[in-house]
Amino acid sequence: MAKHMIVLVLALTMLVAAGCENTDPTPAQREAVETAVRDYLFALAEAYSTLDTSVLEGHASPNEIAAVRKLLKQLVQTADRIDAELIGFEVDSMAIFRHINATVRLIEVWDVTRYGAFDGREKGRNPSSLQSTLLQLRLVDGTWIVVGRSILSRETPVPEPQIVAPEAGD
């Protein structure tokens, strides 16, 4: 009976330890994941601007590339093309699980211009589109790749009204 109790206690201790995994990345992991995120976002911008998802290879999983391809097809069906430029991003949080999975929550800042796909005419521009995004990454053969991207929120900053001072004599 005592032997079974010891085995049970050891098993429970192992389960608790596994459930309390430290998800804080090491400095090297943080740098590697941030580099992968940056490279993916630049490739994503190029994919949107050129309507070519091949630039995502090596940065994203086949499923993620297929998801981007679907979005690009939807743009073409609405006769739109997007020219996207990544202005910057800031990592809000990062967690590493079992040394091979990462979750990164970030704020992305984009300069986005929408064009007619056929006539090339500008339909609209937002030079500072903000997106709160969640990226899922996986370490594959020593390289972090994006396996999923979820846009949590979008924000279009509203320009502040400019106050015009009255001219003298008014």
Give residue ranges: language-model regions.
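Bacterial N-terminal signal peptides that target proteins for export
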Residues: 1-7
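Bacterial N-terminal signal peptides
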Residues: 7-17
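Short, structurally constrained coil/turn elements
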Residues: 14-16, 80, 85, 140
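Short, low-complexity N-terminal intrinsically disordered segments enriched in polar/charged residues
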Residues: 18-54, 58-65, 74
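Short solvent-exposed beta->alpha transition segments
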Residues: 53-103, 111-116
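Exposed beta-sheet edge and beta->alpha loop/turn motif
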Residues: 99-170
